[in-house]
Amino acid sequence: MDIVLEICDYYLFDKVYADVFPKDGAVHEFLKPAIQSFSQIDFPSLPNLDSFDTNSTLISSNNFNISNVNPATIPSYLFSKIASYQDKSEIYGLAPKFFPATDFINTSFLARSNIFRETLSLFIITTIFGWLLYFIVAYLSYVFVFDKKIFNHPRYLKNQMSLEIKRATTAIPVMVLLTIPFFLLELNGYSFLYLDINECTGGYKAILWQIPKFILFTDCGIYFLHRWLHWPSVYKVLHKPHHKWIVCTPFASHAFHPVDGFFQSLPYHLYPLLFPLHKVLYLFLFTFVNFWTVMIHDGSYWSNDPVVNGTACHTVHHLYFNYNYGQFTTLWDRLGNSYRRPDDSLFVKDAKAEEEKKIWKEQTRKMEEIRGEVEGKVDDREYVEQ
């Protein structure tokens, strides 16, 4: 995110923050006492790990005894442990990296590296980008890919598309707010994101390998999180809003409860905290993930690939609830005994109206049996065909 943030700071935010939050301006004068009080707090220093006598003060690796633990040293030890993972050369805002300094870079009391400014900037950028990506990709999918015969499906809801859009547009800012801490960690050097491509970083070969590793890691993480979201107590509170859509349009892709969306995004944010990932590839993969999320909700069934968890597989998940939890592949569903092969009827092209009604009727019958087991007898959805 440092690339995106510096672009925005260079072309827009430096001047905006200088105008709205200038040094010695009214806002700065009002906040000065609070800033000074905060700066005078005596925070514990972060000691050098090498200075710890772990045998006597914390934990003896050879002869662990709870009596050897000195509680007073634990916070400092944890702080130092965390600090040891920080790459100070990757802290954002201390000096420009990609563009020259602007005339406004030092004229706001909120410097580029200020955590409050970073939080506000990230919220604005990611929310707007999230909305734009959602509407552009979903609209293009709706116009050029989406099978509009789904509007006649007996389990299509009244005003469904407007409900999907309302749910998504209100959820995206909250999901962004919940994920900002991960972006802040990245901006402050607590990740394995890198930019230089050389022998030390593995060159272009390493970047090519990062794509399947990212897909496999996140696919695994989402599978288990998705299964957890289907636990009855969790499903009822968090995941049921997304399963309101039995048959989907592309606009259902981001129509989540925001906490549900946050949990399902965790693997994407955890990956660069655990494994090396090129910064440009990181931005590409995050964009790709949003494309993919729209694509698997577009109701157009072109592939019945046994490996790829495509639109047909995800349609089965929305219709029959307890199957196909994976995001990109069918691997974990097969290992977890939750894979359900899409019905052949999904791939019938140019079916006659009567034949299509029979297919939908059979889908509805199977769906209602499973829905009753998952949600109970009462169905609060309002369908077009009641």
Curated annotation (Swiss-Prot):
Pathway(s) the chain acts in: Steroid metabolism; ergosterol biosynthesis; ergosterol from zymosterol: step 3/5
Fatty acid hydroxylase domain location: 214-337
Alphabetical list of InterPro entries matching this protein: Fatty_acid_hydroxylase, Sterol_Desaturase_Related
Cellular component annotations (GO), alphabetically ordered: endoplasmic reticulum lumen; endoplasmic reticulum membrane; membrane; plasma membrane
EC number from the UniProt entry: 1.14.19.20
Record keywords: Endoplasmic reticulum, Iron, Lipid biosynthesis, Lipid metabolism, Membrane, Oxidoreductase, Steroid biosynthesis, Steroid metabolism, Sterol biosynthesis, Sterol metabolism, Transmembrane, Transmembrane helix
Induction text: Expression is repressed during spider biofilm formation.
Major localization listed first in the record, in broad terms: endoplasmic reticulum
Keyword Transmembrane among record annotations: yes
Needed co-factor(s): Fe cation
Motif Histidine box-1 location, chain numbering: 226-230
Top EC class, one word: oxidoreductase
Pfam family, one: FA_hydroxylase
Membrane-spanning parts: 120-140, 172-192, 206-226, 272-292
Motif Histidine box-3: positions: 314-318
BP-aspect Gene Ontology terms: ergosterol biosynthetic process; filamentous growth; filamentous growth of a population of unicellular organisms; filamentous growth of a population of unicellular organisms in response to biotic stimulus; sterol biosynthetic process
Subcellular location: Endoplasmic reticulum membrane
GO molecular function: C-5 sterol desaturase activity; iron ion binding
Coiled-coil regions listed: none
Description of its domains: The histidine box domains may contain the active site and/or be involved in metal ion binding.
Described function: The third module or late pathway involves the ergosterol synthesis itself through consecutive reactions that mainly occur in the endoplasmic reticulum (ER) membrane. Firstly, the squalene synthase ERG9 catalyzes the condensation of 2 farnesyl pyrophosphate moieties to form squalene, which is the precursor of all steroids.
Family in the record: Belongs to the sterol desaturase family.
Official protein name in the record: Delta(7)-sterol 5(6)-desaturase ERG3
Lineage of producing organism: Eukaryota, Fungi, Dikarya, Ascomycota, Saccharomycotina
